Every structure is written in structure tokens, then in C-alpha cells.
Design a protein with these regions (language model features):
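Short terminal hydrophobic/aromatic SLiMs and anchors at protein ends
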Residues: 2, 9-11
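General helical secondary-structure elements
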Residues: 15-16, 120
Length: 181
């Protein structure tokens, strides 16, 4: 079912793209590994190019990581507290004890958009287990937290915001929350 859903999702994206609803300027950006600026990394602001993790980190190999995706509008993170609560809830479900408080993560998120001078953009907090050991659980691995932010305008062509956009709703039902841990 998931494969079919993904296939349908991409067909819809292709349909929208073929109708030129998307703003293609988003696709013409600097690769993320070539950008400049700062990233909040384990409590410090580091140069974008120095925010690196080891190839053998547990988060990469065993998916022991969680993240959020947050939009910035007019210099403010949309529903920041709700996103942060969900990040902490996801971490708890993964058995990850957060090394920072919700207040510290909110403060760091606001700090990074201020330092990056972002008016409209995107914030990506990520939490993962480090590379101290490779095992199924690796509960003793250090927990790392990074928060990146970058400019990211609207998904849609600006003139379509004025003209309006036709949307479709799917007959597919979302899986219930208790279907996945």
C-alpha cells in the first residue's frame, strides 16, 4: 500500500509540476554542502561547512534519529512550540533522551534564523545517535542535535497566489496513529 501511495503522490507532483504550479526558483539553489552561514550544532554556532557527522553514526545506519520541518514566515517560525513538542515526543518514542530542554531548542531555532537573517525560509532541527558504537540499540551513544535554517520562498508561483490554485483531495485514508510505533 505504501509503495502505491508513494507512486500516486509522485504522479500528483508530476501533474502539478507539468501544470507549472510550482515555483522552479526553489530548484535552482546552491547545494546544501556548498552553502555558507551558520548552523546550530550541539549548542554552538558553527560554520555551515564544519557541521559534519561521521559516516558510521548510528542515526544514519539504524535510523535512530528524528527531525522536524518548520516554515519561517516574516521572520517567525510557524507553530514553533508545536513543532518542538512533536520533536521531543518523537525522540521519546525512539528512546532518545534529549540533551536540551524545549525552551533551549526554541531559543536555538530563533537564534539561527536571526543569525542567518532569514525572513521566509525553513528550519530543520535534527536529533541523532552518534558514532561511539555500532549496535542495534546503542543506547550509550551520545545524542547530537543540529538546527539548520535557510531561505526558502513559496512552493508556488507568486501569480498563482493571486489567481488561486485548484486542489484535489485523496480518497485514501491516513493510517491511524497506532498502526506504526
Amino acid at each position: 500500500i505504501l509503495v502505491r501511495y508513494v507512486d500516486i503522490f509522485y504522479q500528483q507532483i508530476y501533474f502539478f509540476v507539468s501544470k507549472k504550479l510550482f515555483n522552479f526558483n526553489l530548484m535552482e539553489t546552491i547545494p546544501y554542502d556548498k552553502r555558507s552561514g551558520k548552523i546550530w550544532f550541539n549548542g554552538e554556532l558553527v560554520d555551515w561547512s564544519n557541521a559534519k557527522v561521521h559516516l558510521l553514526n548510528h542515526g544514519l545506519h539504524y535510523a535512530s534519529c528524528v527531525f522536524e520541518g518548520e516554515r519561517i514566515y516574516d521572520g517567525e517560525i510557524f507553530k514553533l512550540q508545536e513543532h518542538t513538542q512533536r520533536l521531543f515526543h518523537s525522540a521519546k518514542r525512539m528512546g532518545i533522551k534529549m540533551p536540551y530542554s524545549e525552551k533551549e531548542i526554541n531559543s536555538a531555532s530563533n537564534e539561527i534564523i536571526r543569525v542567518q537573517k532569514i525572513k521566509d525560509g525553513y528550519v530543520r532541527p535534527v536529533v541523532w545517535r552518534g558514532s561511539e558504537m555500532m549496535a542495534i540499540s546503542a543506547q550509550k551513544n551520545k545524542i547530537h542535535v543540529g538546527i539548520a535554517a535557510w531561505e526558502w520562498g513559496s512552493y508556488f508561483d507568486p501569480k498563482l497566489k493571486l489567481e488561486g490554485i485548484k486542489l484535489q483531495t485523496s480518497s485514501w485514508r491516513r493510517p491511524p496513529p497506532n498502526s506504526v510505533p
